[in-house]
Amino acid sequence: MDKATRAVIQKATENARSCLETEFREQLDGRYDIRAGRPLPAEPGAHLDADQRRIHSQLVATLEHLRLRGANEQDAVDTYVREAAFTTLNRLAALKMLEARALVKPCVSNGPASTGFKEFSGLAPGLQELPDKGYRLYLECLFDEIAVEVKVLFDRRDPAALLWPRDAALAELLAILNRPELAIAWAEDETIGWIYQYFNSSAEREAMRKQSSVPRNSRELAVRNQFFTPRYVVEFLTDNTLGRTWYEMRAGQTRLTDQCQSLVHEPDERFDPP
């Protein structure tokens, strides 16, 4: 993947993170009365419906768990918002990549106008009565289906999936993911890896290093040292470890000499007899 494409992915990732974190903070504050740096509300507000009261209880339990692990009120909210944004972004990015490989019908590329959602709506006309015409339900059905094989990312029981972007934020997020200059990236296997890396900005990494010369917690350890490994590096390492071992075991008589482009070998190499 060239530098220009990586730059586009980085910009989109940073924009998407900002969009989602702003949205989820506003939801925590305005809907659930959960504010960074302040004690958690003991009871859900009277303005919440039954489903929102359930979500409120789960949010409080999740934040209390973070508190028990050593986070203060501010850090607990910050951590939750970051993880919720990370999970939502990566799920929709994964759907874009599945679309590019024709493994799912178009579901994100045109938002609610996607052909996959249109077919889904045709099977359940009652969805038109929902505020978003059932688009969220459609995406969650896709998550549940994919979670059978990729549970670690798509499991909706994950506390990081308690919040969902409202209409305006979802439209903004989809617009970011569907930028024309980003279209080429979705067919690339490396894209999801670069999104993982760019979610933590270099400015954030530098700020951590200025505050402490060594990582102070598990997140800082990951942010400081977690870098995506490009395909060519993986291929070189694999070709010259496993590939090289097999090459020597077969005394050079193997198809790997043609298949492993990074395998270091000489045409006239000699091998000791077994």
Model-inferred region functions:
Residues 1-274:
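Preference for the N-terminal adenyl/adenosyl cofactor-binding alpha/beta module
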